[in-house]
Amino acid sequence: MAAARLSHRMGRLLEKAPALGPWTRVYSTSPAFAEVLRLPQKQLTKVVYPLRELGQHLAADSGPGLIEQRLFDPSLEDIGRAESIFEATARNRIEYLSSAVRLDHAPSLQQPEVCFIGRSNVGKSSLIKALFSLAPDVEVRISKKPGHTKKMNFFKVGKHFTLVDMPGYGYRAPEDFVDMVETYLKERNNLKRTFLLVDSVVGITKLDNIAIEMCEEFALPYVMILTKIDKSSKGYLLKQVLQIQKFVNTQTQGCFPQLFPISAVTNSGVHLLKCFIADITGSLK
């Protein structure tokens, strides 16, 4: 039984995201990303490819390649294509659908789904607001008080995919959090990837470990996002990223090997994350 379970878990891990298609024609992108493309090269790398920028600060004896697990390394053209998927237009409606406290209350949808989980005050709502910055009519509420999100909130991104904002775990979490989240993660058939947010300033906490164990137990393909990278010095952030990367490499089986450092304040890493989401949901085909 254990061997079969491990085999199933590894099978889920080895599922590959759809390959990015070749740049065969000119695609339009958002004016905001067009401005990013005009940045000087060093600043452009920092905003679009923060992991690559961090890797440039590694000493030669710091373990080459440890930080640069860049399995997903799209071109600027591919990122530009993905940017347009997150831009609300008459033909690409991006909207809040509904909220639910139980899976049987959730909207029944066939399109691919991704969900975001993390402890209270990790910056989840701020990140989702940044992802939807090109959809000004979509309201993502941000509160200074941890634990503001109490339900599963469903957002539809055109005909491409649905994004689900889960309640935060830990401080002021809903009483039925475990039943709500576990049931969703185990039984939502169209769930393509779970994004687990970790505060880059604090690192992986005991509560985060519980969430990681849950993802591993359910054999879920998941991705670790490091939030608030603007809050630390370069040296401290690099130390944190190296520690978390080592944890992912040695202590997990279902976690995508590449970390995604993010700042919802400076937008660093947000464009790359949009492209990754568009890729794994098949939206770039």
Swiss-Prot record:
Binding residues for GTP: 118-125, 147-151, 165-168, 227-230, 262-264
Top-level taxonomic group: Eukaryota
InterPro entries per UniProt: EngB_GTPase, G_ENGB_dom, GTP-bd, GTP-bd_ribosome_bio_YsxC, P-loop_NTPase
Cofactor: Mg(2+)
Domain EngB-type G: residue ranges: 110-283
Sample GO molecular function, one term: metal ion binding
PROSITE patterns on file: G_ENGB (PS51706)
UniProt keyword annotations, A-Z: GTP-binding, Magnesium, Metal-binding, Nucleotide-binding
Binding positions for Mg(2+) per the UniProt entry: S125, T149
Pfam families (UniProt xref): MMR_HSR1
Gene Ontology, cellular component aspect: mitochondrion
Tagged with keyword Acyltransferase: no
Family named by the database record: Belongs to the TRAFAC class TrmE-Era-EngA-EngB-Septin-like GTPase superfamily. EngB GTPase family.
Name of the protein in its database record: GTP-binding protein 8
